[in-house]
């Protein structure tokens, strides 16, 4: 049974594109270094009686869904932690076929081997297909992209064909070029099956190809606010046909200061449109935006109503001083790189720190690359591609990559520098444990971060994580004014004793494996004993790494060509991810990691082999 019209051949070439950042680093994209983006756009005065009518409610409840009782629906929502607010919210769909998507959409879903809708898809699809405005609050990696893209395809198939000069029917606004690029990649596969066209426009890339896509006509446009405003101001596109608006990661767009641009863009769209807003958090600023842009909307919340992290992520917090971070990071990476699944993102606060840490790690033989807002788009794309394909399994990043970076098999996140807010902390660690997978987040928390300590403890408690006693001590010290300097934290030897003797765990990885296998009660008891003591040299000898593992630091960590224990995970005698000084010439010349092509943009900070120019 299918209540929707099948795909319709639009008869035009497919639009191509990939996303970039919405605004340039030097200011607005209008050509001026400073100014008011969108100042040339005039707020439209809409007369709904004069606008062409359009249809937006296509939902017909599947018979299997109609037979489901209210009690069964409530049980499902509780099991998936779905909270719904609003009037006349449809029942969630428990199976893909109950959504009645067109056959070619179902074919793509089948090829991707999805077993059942995620929670946000199950409840979001019926709402979106009913033509209702909605707010979806869900953690990253929850499947929200398909939650709005598949109803968008159904919506487009019920609208008149595009004519010459028409703008997009569906507009998706995203905060960063990385997120927009990933949305475009998802959209392209489904649009190809449905003979629709999508494109992505963003700053930091040539305008010509993006303008050509828009002139040919695209049904779906994924855009960052800055470049879209630039094109609207110079008349390269318009939003007269836009009847389906998506604000993806609305909280992030507000954090980045895009609210004025968003309001300018929304003023160009007819007020009877359908609007869907997606966010990982629900602060008052996002609530105000929803009140201004949405009408009689359904609010769907997945997970706890308060600030919460993905419960599939094991969170480990190490309270330490800034001067200790480098040594702790190296020892942690030695453990992580011994794993078969070792893809890791290390988050730092500044661009300078990103470059310095990347150079240091590569100089010491680690397969690390860095990404931040001052990198050229060509370099950023190349670095992300190397990371996604495992050629450089360590990515050092600023918050420019903390959202929108969707790599399925990231196993570890390390907060080298703690972010400015708990919201950013949640988004950072959300890069791991995508979909239903598990992951681990390590965080270095210093007394300088004391303003965030209470919020961090709340996030840990909500996720039923073990809480480092030092965090609780910082709360006490904050009240007594003893939070700064070494005097504000008790002797580290006590933690080392607790970890090595009472806890009985040799490494951070032992801690994780224990937490994964036992009850939350045991985990809570264990966490009170073990956090912070896992880096001492004593804990690395005669431990899980075998007798040939020596913990004197990175330059002596591989003394033999055939190490025993955990480090035998399929690695050859040269230790691909190791740091055997004998195998390193001038830092990186013998590393088996990819380098950009000679004609690629300069990769400052990455040592190049002979034959490659800097």
UniProtKB/Swiss-Prot annotation:
Residues 328-475 form the Helicase C-terminal domain. It catalyses: ATP + H2O = ADP + phosphate + H(+). There is a cross-link at residue 53 (Glycyl lysine isopeptide (Lys-Gly) (interchain with G-Cter in SUMO1)). Residues 477-614 are annotated as: Transactivation domain. A motif (DEAD box) lies at residues 248-251. Transmembrane segments: none annotated. InterPro entries: DEAD/DEAH_box_helicase_dom, Helicase_ATP-bd, Helicase_C-like, P-loop_NTPase, P68_rpt, RNA-helicase_DEAD-box_CS, RNA_helicase_DEAD_Q_motif. It holds the Pfam family DEAD. GO terms for molecular function: ATP binding; ATP hydrolysis activity; mRNA 3'-UTR binding; nuclear androgen receptor binding; promoter-specific chromatin binding; ribonucleoprotein complex binding; RNA binding; RNA helicase activity. Its main location: nucleus. Identified in the spliceosome C complex. Component of a ribonucleoprotein complex containing mRNAs and RNA-binding proteins including DDX5, HNRNPH2 and SRSF1 as well as splicing regulator ARVCF. Interacts with RBM4; the interaction occurs in an RNA-independent manner. Interacts with AGO1 and AGO2. Interacts with ESR1, AR, EP300, CREBBP, POLR2A, TP53, RUNX2 and HDAC1. Self-associates. Interacts with DDX17. Interacts with BRDT. The large PER complex involved in the repression of transcriptional termination is composed of at least PER2, CDK9, DDX5, DHX9, NCBP1 and POLR2A (active). Belongs to the DEAD box helicase family. DDX5/DBP2 subfamily. Involved in the alternative regulation of pre-mRNA splicing; its RNA helicase activity is necessary for increasing tau exon 10 inclusion and occurs in a RBM4-dependent manner. Binds to the tau pre-mRNA in the stem-loop region downstream of exon 10. The rate of ATP hydrolysis is highly stimulated by single-stranded RNA. Involved in transcriptional regulation; the function is independent of the RNA helicase activity. Transcriptional coactivator for androgen receptor AR but probably not ESR1. This is Probable ATP-dependent RNA helicase DDX5. It comes from Mus musculus (Mouse).
């Amino acid at each position: 049974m299918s209540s929707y019209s099948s795909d319709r051949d639009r008869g035009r070439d497919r639009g191509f594109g990939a996303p970039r950042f919405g605004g340039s680093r030097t200011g607005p994209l209008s050509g001026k270094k400073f100014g008011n983006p969108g100042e040339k756009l005039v707020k439209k005065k809409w007369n709904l009686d004069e606008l062409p009518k359009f249809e937006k409610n296509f939902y017909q409840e599947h018979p299997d869904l109609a037979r489901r009782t209210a009690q069964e629906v409530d049980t499902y929502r509780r099991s998936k932690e779905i909270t719904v607010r609003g009037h006349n919210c449809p029942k969630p769909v428990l199976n893909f076929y109950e959504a009645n998507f067109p056959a070619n959409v179902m074919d793509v879903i089948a090829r991707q081997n999805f077993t059942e809708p995620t929670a946000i898809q199950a409840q979001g699809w019926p709402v979106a297909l009913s033509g209702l405005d909605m707010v979806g609050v869900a953690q990253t990696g929850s499947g929200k992209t398909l939650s709005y893209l598949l109803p968008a395809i159904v919506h487009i198939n019920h609208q008149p064909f595009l004519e010459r000069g028409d703008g997009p029917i569906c507009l998706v606004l995203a905060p960063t070029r990385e997120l927009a690029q990933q949305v475009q990649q998802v959209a392209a596969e489904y649009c190809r099956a449905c003979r629709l066209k999508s494109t992505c426009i963003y700053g930091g890339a040539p305008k010509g190809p993006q303008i050509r896509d828009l002139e040919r006509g695209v049904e779906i446009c994924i855009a960052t606010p800055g470049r879209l405003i630039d094109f609207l101001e110079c008349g390269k596109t318009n939003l007269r046909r836009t009847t389906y608006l998506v604000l993806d990661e609305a909280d992030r767009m507000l954090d980045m200061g895009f609210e004025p641009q968003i309001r300018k863009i929304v003023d160009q769209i007819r007020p009877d449109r359908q609007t869907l807003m997606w966010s990982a958090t629900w602060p008052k600023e996002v609530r105000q935006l929803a009140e201004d842009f949405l009408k009689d909307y359904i609010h769907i919340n997945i997970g706890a109503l308060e600030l919460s992290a993905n419960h599939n992520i094991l969170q480990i917090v190490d309270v330490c001083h800034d001067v200790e971070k480098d040594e702790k990071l190296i020892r942690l990476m030695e453990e992580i790189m011994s794993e078969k699944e070792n893809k890791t993102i290390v988050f730092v606060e500044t661009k300078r720190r990103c470059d310095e840490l990347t150079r240091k790690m590569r100089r010491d033989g680690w397969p690390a690359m860095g990404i931040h807002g001052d990198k050229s788009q060509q370099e950023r794309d190349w670095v992300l591609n190397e990371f996604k394909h495992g050629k450089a399994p360590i990515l050092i990043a600023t918050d420019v990559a903390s959202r929108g970076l969707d790599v399925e098999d990231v196993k570890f996140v390390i907060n080298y520098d703690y972010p400015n807010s708990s919201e950013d902390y949640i988004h950072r660690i959300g890069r791991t444990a995508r979909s239903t997978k598990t992951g681990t987040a390590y965080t270095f928390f210093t007394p300088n971060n004391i303003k965030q300590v209470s919020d961090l403890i709340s996030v840990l408690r909500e996720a039923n994580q073990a809480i480092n006693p030092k965090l609780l001590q910082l709360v006490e010290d904050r009240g007594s004014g003893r939070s700064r300097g070494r005097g504000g934290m008790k002797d580290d030897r006590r933690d080392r004793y607790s970890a090595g003797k009472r806890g009985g765990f040799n490494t951070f990885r032992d801690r994780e494996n224990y937490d994964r296998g036992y009850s939350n009660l045991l985990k809570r008891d264990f966490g009170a004993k073990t956090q912070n003591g896992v880096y001492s040299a004593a804990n690395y000898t005669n431990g899980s790494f075998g007798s040939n593992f020596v913990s004197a630091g990175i330059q002596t960590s591989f003394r033999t060509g055939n190490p025993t224990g955990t480090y035998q995970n399929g690695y050859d005698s040269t230790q691909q991810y190791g740091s055997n000084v004998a195998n390193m010439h001038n830092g990186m010349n013998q590393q088996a990691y990819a380098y950009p092509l000679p004609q690629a943009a300069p990769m400052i900070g990455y040592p190049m082999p002979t034959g490659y120019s800097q």
